[in-house]
Amino acid sequence: MTFEKTLVPNPRPAAHGCNACEIPDGRVWLMWYAGTREGVEDQRVLMSVRNADGNWSEPQVLVDHFQHSNDRWVPEIAAPLILENGEHWVVFSAAPLARFRFREERNLFLRDLEYARLFHAKIDPRTWSIGSPIELFDREALILQGKNVQLANGSWLVLCNSRDSQGRFSSTLVQGSPHDGWEQVCDLEAEPGCLEPSVAQLPDGRLLCYMRYAGYDGCIWRSESDNSPSDFSTPSQTTLRNPHSGIDIAADDEGRLFIAYNDSHRMRTPLTLGISVDGGRTFRCRDIETSNGEFSYPKLLQTSDGQWQVFYTHRRECIAHVSFDPLWILSGRPVFGQFPR
């Protein structure tokens, strides 16, 4: 197998912002938000499950609009979380309907993010019904983007953006669990902005954080920590191009660093997969999408059988799922990942 691509059914006109994980029975649980288009009040978080036969279940609503603080709230990006005891949870961001939409730009409705908050809710995997959403803590202007990451010590990281009153974006890391509570442990800042963090822990305990560049003609930001999410280094730019779009990283037991990103300064195509065997200094890369259109917000997943998958927005119409062979990526083109020191 080089790679195999499947388009996940989507019953709404538009789809974006997926996250996925493997559940205890070996199936893959995928979620994304969908509606008329991004930023319209009719969006909900949908989900589908990839069964043992490789087929995807009929999509269903996972997180609908809900009542909170005397308002109706609209959910956006959501990410699954499976606890050691088998409990299924979802973490998501949402904003009050009264302040959800504030302007239209390039066929998108941009949201008033300063009122967005983080929530979590328990899920019944027998019916995929959701419990009452609960705020993680009392803070506004937080938007979930990345997948939830379990660290070697068992705690979880929730990966978010925050934005100040001047509109500058930063990356915010939240640590904890649904039962033990959550706290903000790190806020990473760099001009003109770094957002949508993705974190991977290497076998030696080191943590790497790669982030979207808040603008065009920039490169992916990188920060690292010896072993604690509270002491990441000041972000610095890599040499990996970024068109103001989401990226994702992951690591395997061999210490290889995987990355999925758009290898462009301006376009959300091509969509590129890369593997580094030297901690991100160099990569071997291949493109899995090269045609016109948007192929964005990738999420990497290694399942318990050792197989690698990537999920991403496919032309804003649905979510694509690709299974790929790392050996195929490793035979690809060489790419520098960091400026020489």
Predicted ranges, named:
Residues M1-R341:
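Asp-box/BNR beta-propeller blade signature and adjacent active/binding-site loops
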